[in-house]
């Protein structure tokens, strides 16, 4: 699905189903530097469960036009424009990593639209290692390699291989936007206040071996 926001094309993968007003809608928000592609398997599964499912590419990511947005707050306001454009009045948001921060901030600003929240591998505060930011800013491939190591290194023990790496490598070169995304995560400080405004069912999903999230906090 392609539509326009702020005179730029926005892409949302919908499994070719479009939006059925008689179905509940689930929004999938990708993590730093990524795109709708990382949600491919999840999107297909949820679509088969009779939901509207939209895996949205943020500006400058995947197939969406425009410049990469520089703050979580800016992204949340952009998402509101998306949902208005698509006439979505109620939704469930599923965010991964940076997408958790976006879902959290969005729900604190536009709570009337949000029916459920699901946070996958994320928290209300996600400080980023400065060395990782520096590598991303310089365009060093090691930034991506470290993210893969810290997030998915042990996945082969459970799923017989790591399809996520192949999915990521099939996306637009994430080095173009990774630094901006990581800095946005690192600079986001409204999480604790935003949490107080949540008034809908909320699920947190964490990976015990995921080193990108501090489970102690």
Positions of PLM-derived features:
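Conserved alpha/beta-hydrolase "acid-adjacent" motif
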Residues: 211-217
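Conserved alpha/beta-hydrolase "nucleophile elbow" surrounding the catalytic nucleophile
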Residues: 30-32, 91, 95-97, 207
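Flexible "cap/lid" loop of the alpha/beta hydrolase fold
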Residues: 101-145
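Conserved HGGG/HGGXW glycine-rich cap/lid loop of the alpha/beta-hydrolase fold
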Residues: 8-65
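Conserved alpha/beta-hydrolase catalytic His-Asp/Glu region
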Residues: 134-199
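Conserved acidic catalytic loop of the alpha/beta-hydrolase fold
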Residues: 73-91
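Residue in the alpha/beta-hydrolase core beta-strand immediately N-terminal to the catalytic nucleophile
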Residues: 57, 92, 115-118
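Short beta-strand/loop motif that positions the catalytic acidic residue
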Residues: 198, 204-206, 210
């Amino acid at each position: 699905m392609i539509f326009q926001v702020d005179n730029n094309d926005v892409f949302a993968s919908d499994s070719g189903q479009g939006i059925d007003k008689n179905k509940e809608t689930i929004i999938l928000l990708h993590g730093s530097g990524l795109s709708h592609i990382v949600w491919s398997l999840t999107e297909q599964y949820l679509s088969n469960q009779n939901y509207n499912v939209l895996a949205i590419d943020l500006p400058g990511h995947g197939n969406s036009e425009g410049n990469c947005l520089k703050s979580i707050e800016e992204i949340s306001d952009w998402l509101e424009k998306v949902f208005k454009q698509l006439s979505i009045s109620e939704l469930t948001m599923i965010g991964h990593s940076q997408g958790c921060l976006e879902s959290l901030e969005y729900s604190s600003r536009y709570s009337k639209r949000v029916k459920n929240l699901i946070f996958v591998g994320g928290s209300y505060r996600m400080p980023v290692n400065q060395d990782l930011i520096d590598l991303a800013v310089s365009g060093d491939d090691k930034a991506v390699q470290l993210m893969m190591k810290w997030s998915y290194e042990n996945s082969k023990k459970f799923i017989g291989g790591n399809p996520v790496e192949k999915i990521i490598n099939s996306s637009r070169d994430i080095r173009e936007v990774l630094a901006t995304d990581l800095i946005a995560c690192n600079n986001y400080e409204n999480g604790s206040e935003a949490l107080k405004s949540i008034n809908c069912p909320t699920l947190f999903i964490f990976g015990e071996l995921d080193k990108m999230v501090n489970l102690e906090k």
